[in-house]
Structure formats: structure tokens, C-alpha cells
């Protein structure tokens, strides 16, 4: 019974945190960026989304609309 109570409490905490992140997503993103500067560097290098560069290189908008 104690384990179930802990699981329910953890789920409630997770739900509260997710709702706070949804409502204050801009502020939380700023905090996350401050806490994790590595993620900012990765996003600058576009290592997280490498297909964006490939798509723009191989298929420019001018070739898509002749």
C-alpha cells in the first residue's frame, strides 16, 4: 500500500510540473537554457535537426516551384 501511495504522489507531482511547463513554457525554456548551455550550443550547430540543412541544400524553394 505504501508503494502505491508513493506512485500516486509521484504521478501527481509529474502532472503538476507538466501543467506548469505548459502554462509557463517561455519562462521554463529560458531556465532550461540557463541550466543547460550545451543544448543551446547543439541547437546553434543544428546537430539536433540535421535534416533541415540537407533539405534546404538539396531542394531549394526555387526548384520546388518552377
From Swiss-Prot:
It is found in: Mitochondrion membrane. The chain crosses the membrane at residues 8-24. It is a single-pass membrane protein. GO terms for cellular component: mitochondrial membrane; proton-transporting ATP synthase complex. The modification N6-acetyllysine is found at residues 54, 57. Keywords: Acetylation, ATP synthesis, CF(0), Extinct organism protein, Hydrogen ion transport, Ion transport, Membrane, Mitochondrion, Transmembrane, Transmembrane helix, Transport. Subunit 8, of the mitochondrial membrane ATP synthase complex (F(1)F(0) ATP synthase or Complex V) that produces ATP from ADP in the presence of a proton gradient across the membrane which is generated by electron transport complexes of the respiratory chain. ATP synthase complex consist of a soluble F(1) head domain - the catalytic core - and a membrane F(1) domain - the membrane proton channel. These two domains are linked by a central stalk rotating inside the F(1) region and a stationary peripheral stalk. Component of the ATP synthase complex composed at least of ATP5F1A/subunit alpha, ATP5F1B/subunit beta, ATP5MC1/subunit c (homooctomer), MT-ATP6/subunit a, MT-ATP8/subunit 8, ATP5ME/subunit e, ATP5MF/subunit f, ATP5MG/subunit g, ATP5MK/subunit k, ATP5MJ/subunit j, ATP5F1C/subunit gamma, ATP5F1D/subunit delta, ATP5F1E/subunit epsilon, ATP5PF/subunit F6, ATP5PB/subunit b, ATP5PD/subunit d, ATP5PO/subunit OSCP. This is ATP synthase F(0) complex subunit 8.
Amino acid at each position: 500500500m505504501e508503494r502505491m501511495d508513493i506512485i500516486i504522489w509521484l504521478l501527481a507531482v509529474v502532472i503538476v510540473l507538466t501543467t506548469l511547463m505548459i502554462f509557463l513554457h517561455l519562462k521554463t525554456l529560458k531556465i532550461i537554457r540557463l541550466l543547460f548551455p550545451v543544448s543551446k550550443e547543439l541547437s546553434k550547430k543544428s546537430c539536433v535537426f540535421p535534416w533541415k540543412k540537407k533539405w534546404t541544400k538539396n531542394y531549394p524553394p526555387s526548384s520546388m516551384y518552377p
